[in-house]
């Protein structure tokens, strides 16, 4: 949600992000607050891929890419970006009239098998949060589909090594069913860190998540 601002001048922010050297990014719901052409202009200023596999325009991810692969120490990292499907409930219709917002669950069912097959480590970057308590499974909000993080874990934890979340502005760093889960606060106040160990045959173990 920090990618664009109401000043209608995104260059100062994107310049900072480019200097930080991110491998990929994902859009949040507030990125749509200032119309689609401005958002696309901002994305084009970035030197890394912005992933959003579940928001579609002309039969493809509206950012141009939903999945990205890159190498770290000989390991293939496969990443998919997803954003809460609930944006049409808040946003001005004219700003998003060319877009289709799909469920993160629906998109993962389609894309995750291939992503898992091609990757040593699978990272799901989801601008959405958790609709249920991670320990008890009890609902923490109305189950509207705005947040699908708990259901993502329930259905796909065997195929996901890292689940990066957001939207709810919570401080979460934990491991559930061998999936590292982080949600590093809001407004750039926290940084999430996940440390992996791996063997020569590329068997990956999560060492820490904080």
For each of these PLM feature ranges, what is it?
Residues 1-210:
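Acidic, metal/ion-coordinating pockets
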